[in-house]
A protein has these predicted regions:
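Basic, helix-initiating cap at the start of DNA-binding domains
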Residues: 1-37, 54
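Short amphipathic alpha-helical segment with a characteristic S/N-K-E followed by hydrophobic residues
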Residues: 13, 28, 51-56, 66-67, ...
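Short hydrophobic/aromatic patch on the recognition helix
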Residues: 38-49
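Amphipathic alpha-helical segments used for helix-helix packing
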Residues: 59-60, 90-117
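Hydrophobic alpha-helical connector segments
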Residues: 67-97
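C-terminal peripheral helix-coil segments that are non-catalytic and often amphipathic
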Residues: 81, 125, 129-136, 163-195
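Amphipathic alpha-helical packing segments from all-alpha helical-bundle domains
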Residues: 93, 110-137, 147
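Hydrophobic alpha-helical segments that form the core
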Residues: 141-163, 173-180
Length: 195
């Protein structure tokens, strides 16, 4: 376990990295700039993160909150729970601001591309589990490709945040999930209960 002072330095470096990413993009993040902004020695940054990319990766992943995967017995309730959580935490909002910057930089930098893939994998994990549970319950077809199902569910939110650069409101969440759930459950292997 890291010592308290070490933990404080770690947090200060990650916070400074996120601030720099938001202000200057990936190209604006240097170990020198993070050291100056955070008050953490460059040697400490190298010891904790090994490289600029390691620092960016840790900062981006730090914005991904691990949400417990719900299992309410209802695809609709599980998705509403997750998307409610995704859109209402500060770290999640920061992540949605960071992702377009990282995606743009990923076109030119394979290490940044790996970071983006890692962040998306973390974000998709609980959604994939919820969809798998829905398949097991017969709410959606067992033959439905889960990557396609994820695209149906996540696509509108990604478009809203990254292309339109608009906030994801509760009304938007409800409208999208109503449509996505209707589409997904239309593939069901069993008749859906009413109510």
């Amino acid at each position: 376990m890291a010592r308290p002072r070490s933990q404080e330095a770690h947090k200060a470096a990650l916070d400074a990295t996120v601030e720099l990413l938001l202000e200057a993009g990936v190209e604006g993040v240097t170990l020198e700039e993070v050291a100056a902004r955070s008050g953490v020695a460059k040697s400490t940054l190298y010891r904790h993160f090994e490289s600029r990319e390691g620092l960016i990766a840790k900062a981006a992943r730090g914005c991904v909150i691990e949400h417990p995967t719900p299992d309410t017995g209802s695809l609709a309730d599980d998705l509403r729970y997750l998307f409610g959580r995704f859109s209402h935490t500060e770290d999640e909002k920061r992540l949605s601001e960071l992702l377009p910057l990282l995606i743009d930089a990923a076109k030119r930098d394979p290490e940044i591309q790996a970071i983006v893939e890692s962040v998306f994998a973390e974000r998709k994990r609980p959604l994939r589990t919820v969809l798998q549970l829905a398949q097991l319950r017969g709410e959606i077809s067992r033959e439905l490709d889960l990557d396609t199902a994820l695209a149906i569910v996540v696509g509108p939110f990604t478009y809203r945040r990254m292309v339109e650069q608009r906030e994801v409101t509760d009304d938007f969440i409800d409208a999208v999930l109503n449509g996505a759930i209707a589409a997904l459950t239309s593939t069901a292997d069993v008749e859906q209960p009413v109510g």
